[in-house]
């Protein structure tokens, strides 16, 4: 162990003390390898010219989809590699982009004066460092970043995040990972992770290829509504987001977008051939898996990493058309309690429905409410393709959509990338790739027949169930859990008992906890907790929003410093306000219709105080009301009220999924005419204040 006294940082008067163990090793400066093509205007013109004069007629005459794909990619790669070969660059970044040699020299001189004890010289140099830093930061923003907001907003936002230090990717989060409690060597990490991801589906039978071939051979002529127009493909290509990651085929979106006019016809032919024949080319069934840590740093490969599959952009375009056809058929069949990846439904709607049921039940103090939050283990990775195929047939999906969807999953391949390392490519026997459009849709089909007699909601794989009874040992929730276990065994799904939790809500006479029968799944008791985060919002056993408000306030407290950094860097106030709205206000307002009605005055003031503090940093000379006027912002309380009213207006529409929660006032049999301004909805008179915390009760009581 050694210690080192360093000069104060910035304008601080306090000296720094640096402590380190002798055995500590300094991590090397991060490096990353970037593979890219030089796609300037001249290169794009040359590529477009050669593609335009290629013999695509030969490709259009081919009946086999895989042969068409092979021809397309061979011609495309040959032309692109001729004019824009792939280049590799290794980048090293351990300094802020605005730092200059002069600035470093001043810092070294300041530190030398500090060590020598020359106080007057140190003060002079310290002031020079602080002044120069401020000038450099402001000049860097005005010269290199500010103009990007209009020309390239993505680069502007990336630069802003770099200034703040937001989401800095640090590969050290993948160090010291374990698999089955054994450490994994860094040099072998991608292969170990890929092998584990593939092994999750062990024991599940691969798709019965002969059955799929039989369905494919019996396909009728493709209906006209499933034939994609050349313009539709052109439009999809022209709308590609150039900032999105390049797929495993190494074809950049910038290339596809700029060549949309010349590529529309051959890509259209390839997609239509794929839909007609029910064959997805092998180039579209290969994924690069990127790992997203669920916590930082990640420790356990089994539970701390979320695999996201990056697929080729052309495959995504084909999926967008299939997604549309899927929705047209399944929207009328989807479970009314499924809110995930479904048109006109959201997490807020799911939470409103679930919380309304709980608040209504709690209005009767004798009721004992038990809420079960179910967590599926590797839900997407455990999808049995044979079970999925049968369910697609049972729901009478169009033949071409069924066969195409299953062909997309059959014999998929993936490799894992960690930093600049790629694993070997392995084949998958089960599951749906996360990050694709088809993944959530396929899981919705899998879980659509999972229904309960109790109140429940589903958001893709997040499932929550609540039982209400005057008997604290009511077995209805245990019966539901047993039914869930049977369903899982039948559908090759697994429940993560360790992450499945229960909350008990009761406001009547106290009940001896030792007399309460715990919920049991496969011989393991489900843990009872006082609070749980459901779809981003914390629920607790007291049915207050204390835990959730504390959670969002703690989360944004870490981000207020970013506002200070931007102001000090010289970023324009309007731009800082935009950043505030994106990274702070969005957190303070997430799902606000669910919890706004239950806020205390103090909690509302605490939330408003965050906006006051940020605006005080941006406009220190203005009062809060003056800052609101200058920025055009509304007070957060007003915004939450507007969100409540807007959400309720949508729910009042007869076709809204939550419209059934509204009760119309009974009409007078003697006078069926309703007075013009009479409010049409009513709610039972509340016995306690808890019912008034419900979104529905609040809106009706306030005559929204």
Please identify what each model-predicted range represents.
Residues 322-338, 361-362, 440-467:
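Active-site palm subdomain of RNA-directed nucleic acid polymerases
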Residues 1-91, 169-172, 182, 186-187, ...:
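Surface polyanion/phosphate-binding segment centered on an Asp-His-Pro turn
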Residues 242-251, 300-310, 349-393:
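Conserved catalytic palm subdomain of right-hand nucleotidyl-transferase polymerases, strongest
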Residues 204-235, 279, 285-288, 327-374, ...:
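Active-site-proximal segment of RNA-dependent polymerases
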Residues 20-26, 47, 65-70, 75-78, ...:
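Surface-exposed loop/turn segments and immediately adjacent short secondary-structure elements
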Residues 376-459, 468:
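Conserved polymerase palm-domain catalytic core
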Residues 223, 419-420, 479, 494-530:
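Short, conserved micro-motifs composed of acidic
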Residues 92-195, 226-271, 276-283, 289, ...:
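Short, charged alpha-helical motifs in flexible N/C-terminal segments and linkers
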